[in-house]
């Protein structure tokens, strides 16, 4: 990646800066990291901007490897019709949302989408159960019993479901998140 064809143009860098919460240096680092996932012959700027990287490759990045929501993160940010790969721009969008400079509203919107496992626009009992399992692990020693899970989800809904419809919508989720001072600082990925 040392040749003249291996750096993003000033115009493209400026456009990416305008469209994301990332600095020029962060965009260049993101491009370098993305290119490292590509075969050597696809590492030119032109190729890298038109090539998709499989989730398997993206998930090999140490920054995502240990995240319990890594598959959902990739699915939410993928623009692929089959939702199984990321383009460089998808990768930039992901890093932008998880950057320190992304707004709390943007972060909470994407957190909601990541936690909405069935993509129906609400967090229902099944979504909340999957969310808890991702956080606690699904091993015998960490998995909650059915009664513990029911009690926990009842408590979450009691606290969060303002309109009492049995689900948490985006505005209810954002209301809860707004009362969590650590959310924005913990919802980040740094390359």
UniProtKB/Swiss-Prot annotation:
Location of the protein in the cell: Membrane; Cell membrane, Sarcolemma; Cell membrane; Apical cell membrane
Alphabetical list of PANTHER family matching this protein: CALCIUM AND INTEGRIN BINDING FAMILY MEMBER 2, CALCIUM AND INTEGRIN-BINDING PROTEIN 1
Covalent lipid sites (N-myristoyl glycine): 2
Tissue: Expressed strongly in Sertoli cells, weakly in pachytene spermatocytes, round spermatids and condensing spermatids (at protein level). Expressed in testis. Expressed in cardiac myocytes and endothelial cells. Expressed in heart, liver, spleen, lung, kidney, brain and inner ear. In the inner ear, expressed in the vestibule, basilar membrane and spiral ganglion cells.
Alphabetical keyword list: Angiogenesis, Apoptosis, Calcium, Cell adhesion, Cell cycle, Cell division, Cell membrane, Cell projection, Cytoplasm, Cytoskeleton, Differentiation, Lipoprotein, Magnesium, Membrane, Metal-binding, Myristate, Nucleus, Repeat, Spermatogenesis
Keyword Magnesium: yes
Gene Ontology CC annotation, any one: filopodium tip
Annotated source species: Mus musculus (Mouse)
SMART domains: EFh
Residues reported in the UniProt entry to bind Ca(2+) 1: 116, 118, 120, 122, 127
Miscellaneous comment text of the record: The binding of either calcium or magnesium significantly increases the structural stability of the protein in comparison to apo-CIB (calcium- and magnesium-free form).
Binding sites annotated in the UniProt record for Ca(2+) 2: 161, 163, 165, 167, 172
Record-annotated EF-hand domain positions: 103-138, 148-183
Conditions for induction: Up-regulated upon cardiomyocytes hypertrophy (at protein level).
UniProt GO molecular function: calcium ion binding; calcium-dependent protein kinase inhibitor activity; protein-membrane adaptor activity; small GTPase binding; transmembrane transporter binding
Subunit structure: Monomer. Interacts with the heterodimeric integrin alpha-IIb/beta3 (ITGA2B-ITGB3). Interacts with ITGA2B (via cytoplasmic domain); the interaction is direct and calcium-dependent. Interacts with the protein kinases PLK2/SNK and PRKDC (via the region immediately upstream of the kinase domain). Interacts with PLK3; the interaction inhibits PLK3 kinase activity. Interacts with PSEN2. Interacts (via C-terminus) with F8. Interacts with NBR1 (via C-terminus). Interacts with FEZ1 (via C-terminus).
Membrane topology: Lipid-anchor
InterPro entries: CIBP (IPR051433), EF-hand-dom_pair (IPR011992), EF_Hand_1_Ca_BS (IPR018247), EF_hand_dom (IPR002048)
GO process annotations (BP): angiogenesis; apoptotic process; cell adhesion; cell division; cellular response to growth factor stimulus; cellular response to nerve growth factor stimulus; cellular response to tumor necrosis factor; cytoplasmic microtubule organization
Domain notes: The EF-hands may also bind magnesium ions in the presence of high Mg(2+) levels and low Ca(2+) levels.
UniProt-recorded name of the protein: Calcium and integrin-binding protein 1
Gene that this sequence comes from: Cib1
Domain of life where this protein originates: Eukaryota
Family annotation (Pfam families): EF-hand_7 (PF13499)
């Amino acid at each position: 990646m040392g040749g003249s064809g291996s750096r993003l143009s000033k115009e493209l860098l400026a456009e990416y800066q305008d469209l994301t919460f990332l600095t020029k240096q962060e965009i260049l680092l993101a491009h370098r990291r993305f290119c490292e996932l590509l075969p050597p012959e696809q590492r030119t700027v032109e190729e890298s901007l038109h090539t998709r990287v499989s989730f398997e490759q993206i998930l090999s990045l140490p920054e995502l490897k240990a995240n319990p929501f890594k598959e959902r993160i990739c699915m939410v940010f993928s623009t692929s019709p089959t939702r199984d790969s990321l383009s460089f721009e998808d990768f930039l969008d992901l890093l932008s949302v998880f950057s320190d400079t992304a707004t709390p509203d943007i972060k909470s919107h994407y957190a909601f989408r990541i936690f909405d496992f069935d993509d129906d626009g609400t967090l229902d009992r099944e979504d909340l159960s999957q969310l808890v399992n991702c956080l606690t692990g699904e091993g015998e020693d960490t998995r909650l019993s059915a009664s513990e899970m029911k009690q926990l989800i009842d408590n979450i809904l009691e606290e969060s479901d303002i309109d009492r419809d049995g689900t948490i919508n985006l505005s209810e989720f954002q209301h809860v998140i707004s009362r969590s001072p650590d959310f924005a600082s913990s919802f980040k990925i740094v390359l």
